[in-house]
Amino acid sequence: MPISLGNAFAKNFLGNAPKWYKSAILLFLVINPIAFYLDPFAAGWLLVVEFIFTLAMALKCYPLQPGGLLAIEAVLIGMTSAEQVKHELVANIEVLLLLVFMVAGIYFMKQLLLYVFTKLLIRIHSKTLLSLAFCLVSAFLSAFLDALTVIAVVISVATGFYAIYHKVSSGKEFGHQHDHTDDHSVHELSRQHLDDFRAFLRSLMMHAAIGTALGGVCTLVGEPQNLIIGEQAGWSFGEFAIRMAPVTIPVFICGLLTCILVEKCRWFGYGAKLPDAVRHIMEDYNRYEEAGRSPQDKAKLIVQAVIAIWLILGLAMHLAAVGLIGLSVIVLATSLTGINDEHSLGKAFQEALPFTALLAVFFSVVAVIIDQQLFRPVIQWVLAAEPDDQLALFYLANGLLSMVSDNVFVGTVYINEVKTALLNNAINREQFDLLAVAINTGTNLPSVATPNGQAAFLFMLTSALAPLLRLSYGRMVWMALPYTLVLGLVGFFSVELLLGPATEWFYQAGWLLPHSGAPAVLPALH
């Protein structure tokens, strides 16, 4: 039966998203201009909550469309300007380049990654040990590489594992073409194993994601905000690591203990083991690959291994912007492994570009936060506190705000405010150094609570793999909860109880030298 034109428009709006979801987005679009007219500050926070809602409902509808509509309206009604949005995008161009080029570069190294991690999967039989290995490897890599790059590697590996089992459970051979997003062809007897395998991969993904936070907070190059805070404070690579150590070492140890505990006790969705049927398929796949590996295939693996070394050295030594190193990986990997047609190149960009567009929308919301000064009351309250209370309050304020906003933005806002206080002689240099540690750890650790706190977590949530593993916003928050509590609380007590005495001991031991005055440069926000 034909439908009316009006119903056709309604049906087309946000596609196959549920009707209640479409109604909610339309309601947001109607309410926001009214709220902005009545109270711009409240309207700004309402927009932040609405954007978080679109992220939470990512499995109902990709957040780009509803979030984009809200962002466009925000610019139109004057909550922010197109110029401010452009400023945010320009300020974060390195992150955007990373997403476009680095994720595509990792795609062309899939064979090597699958080779290495398949060996790891079939040789380590203990799930707890395997989880610990994923967490440790992610932490080590994230201390020197960007967390987004590490998560891109983990997603590539998990997708490869999932595709192998899905293909076999659908009655196909290893060499056959197969669509691993379609469950209709999965044999009934294999469905339970598939669900168990999803739970297994979900837990590994989350352990790896938390690992990026554990490692990323430790070094100057681990996270973008680390670099901003380190530059503002005038710290070298070594000094940064030493100053963070009173907080990062206890947090790292407790994070690894949490990994072991949730796996052993099977809490919060962890503890799922690799089904024997899946292990046998992985072992068969490994033997199939080994038997069929030609000299040309071996040459490709060697080339990819050499490129991986270049990738790690290039990023760890900051030889170029991350995105440009990613572009060099694309050029080297394709030219030296025989990929020379546009169609094959195009596939590599499919995963990253939707998220790149979503991140641009996210920066539009950050522009609203800046223009409407949504964080100013919290910042003023913390700076007005007594010096003895400031460390704990800065840690808490940064942590809470980083759960709802980009932690790079939060860290940048706070370090600039503290730097201004130092230049105005409101605080001394010793207090500034301690506050910088509290800000850095506050933005990095509690932000694991939600996917919008860290770009790497958001990338994982909105990746093509998330719906395959049934990894929703709510499930990510639930699985991150034990880590949020442990990392957040251990970080808080370390800042409150250990940071001051340990830093004093570092001075006395000669590991640190006191700074005199403020560093010369105070860069603009972002």
UniProtKB/Swiss-Prot annotation:
GO terms for molecular function: sodium:proton antiporter activity. It is found in: Cell inner membrane. Its main location: membrane. Keywords: Antiport, Cell inner membrane, Cell membrane, Ion transport, Membrane, Sodium, Sodium transport, Transmembrane, Transmembrane helix, Transport. It is a multi-pass membrane protein. One of its GO terms (cellular component) is plasma membrane. It catalyses: 2 Na(+)(in) + 3 H(+)(out) = 2 Na(+)(out) + 3 H(+)(in). It holds the Pfam family NhaB. The chain crosses the membrane at residues 25-45, 52-72, 89-109, 130-164, 204-224, 242-262, 305-325, 350-370, 391-411, 448-468, 479-499, 505-525. PANTHER family: NA(+)_H(+) ANTIPORTER NHAB, TRANSPORTER ARSB-RELATED. NCBIfam families: NhaB, PRK09547.1. Na(+)/H(+) antiporter that extrudes sodium in exchange for external protons. HAMAP family: NhaB. Belongs to the NhaB Na(+)/H(+) (TC 2.A.34) antiporter family. This is Na(+)/H(+) antiporter NhaB. It comes from Aeromonas salmonicida (strain A449).
